[in-house]
Amino acid sequence: MGKPYFRGQSIHRLDAKGRLRIPTKFREVLQNHYTDALVITRMGECLLAYPPEEWEKIENKAREFSQVQPEHRAFMRYFISSAEECEFDNQGRILIPPFLREEANLTQDVLLAGVLTNFEIWNKSTWDAHIKLDKDSYQKIMEFMAGTGL
């Protein structure tokens, strides 16, 4: 099937120390095709988790941007500066740093959503609200996607 991607959804529970078990199918993608670690950063109401090799592509592209543009500096402060490398413990869990847990309002029930080269980490209730909005806008989303050739 070619290059492996993160696909599907999985619901997990964050433990009291802020550790999150990563689904086996996501771990297998990492172990078989990437370094077995994650770089996690914030994006709006969720967190994004990247294999280090995919994250490196983002950093390389970001280095090409002009340092004087306010939008670039804001991107670097918001997205790049919040990135944390997280390694797995021997039970397949990562420790999400407190400031990132707070940013995404991660308390207990967490949904992981595979989106190809990375996956999103959501508070389950926040995810449910976003999916409802997406369903309400489904026709517009499909028209947009048709315009992209998909």
From Swiss-Prot:
Pfam families: MraZ
Annotated SpoVT-AbrB domain residues: 9-54, 83-126
GO cellular component: cytoplasm; nucleoid
Binding partners and assembly: Forms oligomers.
This protein's name: Transcriptional regulator MraZ
Matches recorded under Gene3D superfamilies: Transcriptional regulator MraZ domain
PROSITE patterns with a match to the protein in the record: SPOVT_ABRB (PS51740)
InterPro entries xref list: MraZ, MraZ_C, MraZ_dom, MraZ_N, MraZ_sf, SpoVT-AbrB_dom, SpoVT-AbrB_sf
Family from the record: Belongs to the MraZ family.
GO molecular function: DNA-binding transcription factor activity; transcription cis-regulatory region binding
Keywords: Cytoplasm, DNA-binding, Repeat, Transcription, Transcription regulation
Gene Ontology biological process terms, A to Z: negative regulation of DNA-templated transcription initiation
Subcellular location(s) of the protein: Cytoplasm, Nucleoid
